[in-house]
Amino acid sequence: MAKISKRVQALRAKVDRNRIYPVAEALALVKECATAKFDESIDVAVNLGVDARKSDQVVRGSVVLPAGTGKTVRVAVFAQGDKAEAARAAGADVVGFDDLAEQVKGGTIDFDLCIATPDAMRVVGQLGQILGPRGLMPNPKVGTVTMDVTTAVKNAKAGQVQYRTDKGGLVHATIGRASFGVEALQQNLNAFIEALVKARPAAAKGVYLRRVAVSSTMGAGVRVEPTTASA
């Protein structure tokens, strides 16, 4: 069994694993535990009361975090004509159509998020085996297949995060950095939880927000009261 470092032991000692914390206190504690030499990400994990093995209970979508994510996102847009110009004007880093598809096929993928107009999907669809495994395939459910490329690009640049339940009904997202203030992190967490609540499937039964926990990249997880997380 691998030894647990003194640093990790000290971090774990600060967190009462049997306690469910109010959100502001939990976020302050997570920030206190973020002692790495880099600006750690602050993440949330939410266990939802859904059977994600059933297609009608998969929770998927996107939300713009009001305080941003602290990360610079490079955005690619597959579009032509006026839509291509609109994407460039909105701040897209890479814009193209067949030429961009050829770049991707050649192994040049210098972007973090991909947006496409509906007519471009005939080209993008051929890139599924390349973009899919990287989580870059545009999808209308998260707003990345759209005619409104201006809004899509601006949202991506402003701090939009995408989410989807895994097979166990768990959703993960980054809601900021350790350098963020507690208030900014709380605003982002509230926005994320509200988005999950709005996306609740009609087929979901019983308690929906079963467990909410926040953590930093290298820190311990801290459970949060679901009611205060969405207050």
Curated annotation (Swiss-Prot):
A GO biological process of this protein is: regulation of translation
- Going by the entry's taxonomy, the superkingdom of the source organism is recorded as Bacteria
Which keywords belong to this entry? Repressor, Ribonucleoprotein, Ribosomal protein, RNA-binding, rRNA-binding, Translation regulation, tRNA-binding
Q: Which GO terms describe its cellular component?
A: cytosolic large ribosomal subunit
Enumerate the GO terms in the molecular function aspect: rRNA binding; structural constituent of ribosome; tRNA binding
Q: What family does the Swiss-Prot or TrEMBL record give for this protein? A: Belongs to the universal ribosomal protein uL1 family.
Question: What does the UniProt function comment say about this protein?
Answer: Binds directly to 23S rRNA. The L1 stalk is quite mobile in the ribosome, and is involved in E site tRNA release. Protein L1 is also a translational repressor protein, it controls the translation of the L11 operon by binding to its mRNA.
Quaternary data: Part of the 50S ribosomal subunit.
Fetch the Gene3D superfamilies from UniProt: 3.30.190.20, 3.40.50.790
InterPro entries tied to this protein: Ribosom_uL1_bac-type, Ribosomal_uL1, Ribosomal_uL1-like, Ribosomal_uL1/biogenesis, Ribosomal_uL1_3-a/b-sand, Ribosomal_uL1_CS
> Protein name, please?
Large ribosomal subunit protein uL1
Source organism of the structure: Azoarcus sp. (strain BH72)
